[in-house]
């Protein structure tokens, strides 16, 4: 339910396209994947059409699509109800990546309100973009480019705050919410709290947040362990495991978005 195939990013493209990614899925007995449509224009139907034209002739399994909303205008809002007729019933918004993906809270509210009124599900990438930008700037100013600083500049508490903020916005919008790639113990606590207040909030995590920790970002080959959000501490892994076991977290996805390590498709 959460993959990124043939995704342009940081001057390169993810290494799995719609053929190789879905072929690998089939080998692993996965018969359906759900990819994301980038909002490359203000015509959402055109964004969906362009991706389908590229993917339809190459996929080896069934696939579905989520729609990223990364730029807001009233005209975009008017198009959201029509997404269902195009086979897209879920939208993703971001509270991070300030320079290219993040929506302001007021715009996230607008998206959620329309989605809730028309039976669409809003997915949320929950991190604190302002804190990340500041910490990255400070780290770079003193020369910290080691992989471990990917985790140190994306604070866990920022993710916890963003989950609670997203839940609060969803409550005000009277809309269901799906939190993607949860990786912090406090996020699970916030999910439980939101549910205790009657909110419809779904939690998702990924295998990397169950089996690996930020100590892997200090290995010789640490670049191989970079993912976003980053790997966390063992106590976070343990809480995520408990959340899966007791049903607080309902979805185990992959967030599959690989890049070649050997420089075949270098990241700028």
Where are these regions (language model features)?
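Short, ordered loop/turn segments at secondary-structure junctions
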Residues: 4, 37-39, 68, 95-96, ...
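Metal-associated gating/positioning segment near the N- to mid-region
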Residues: 1-58, 75
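N-terminal small/glycine-rich loop or linker at the start of catalytic domains
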Residues: 1-8, 58-60, 212-225
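Histidine/acidic residue-rich metal-binding segments in metalloenzymes
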Residues: 75-252
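Short acidic/polar active-site loop segments enriched in Thr and Asp
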Residues: 30-32, 61, 89, 250
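Short catalytic-loop micro-motif centered on adjacent basic/acidic residues
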Residues: 33-35, 64-67, 176-181
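Active-site beta->alpha loop and helix N-cap motifs at the rims of alpha/beta catalytic domains
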Residues: 67-74
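Alpha-helix-loop-beta-strand connector modules within alpha/beta enzyme cores
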Residues: 44-66, 109-124
């Amino acid at each position: 339910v959460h993959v990124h195939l043939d995704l342009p990013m940081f001057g390169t493209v993810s290494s799995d396209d719609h053929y190789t990614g879905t072929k690998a899925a089939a080998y692993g007995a996965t018969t359906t994947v759900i990819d994301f449509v980038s909002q490359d224009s203000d015509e959402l139907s055109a964004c969906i059409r362009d991706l389908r034209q590229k993917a339809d002739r190459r996929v080896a399994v069934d696939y579905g699509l989520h729609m990223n909303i990364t730029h807001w205008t009233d005209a975009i809002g008017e198009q959201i109800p029509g997404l269902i007729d195009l086979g897209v019933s879920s939208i993703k918004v971001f509270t991070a990546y300030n320079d290219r993906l993040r929506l302001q809270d007021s715009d996230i509210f607008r998206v959620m309100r329309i989605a809730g009124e028309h039976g669409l599900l809003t997915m949320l990438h929950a991190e604190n973009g302002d804190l990340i930008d500041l910490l990255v700037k400070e780290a770079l100013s003193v020369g910290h480019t080691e992989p471990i600083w990917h985790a140190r500049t994306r604070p866990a508490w920022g993710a916890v705050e963003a989950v609670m903020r997203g839940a609060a916005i969803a409550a005000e919008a009277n809309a269901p919410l799906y939190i993607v790639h949860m990786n912090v113990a406090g996020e699970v606590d916030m999910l439980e709290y939101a549910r205790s207040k009657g909110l419809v909030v779904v939690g998702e995590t990924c295998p990397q947040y169950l089996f690996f920790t930020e100590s892997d970002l200090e290995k010789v080959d640490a670049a191989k362990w970079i993912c976003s959000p980053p790997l966390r501490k063992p106590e976070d892994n343990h809480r995520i495991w408990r959340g899966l076991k007791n049903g607080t977290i309902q979805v185990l996805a992959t967030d599959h978005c690989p890049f070649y390590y050997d420089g075949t498709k270098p990241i700028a």
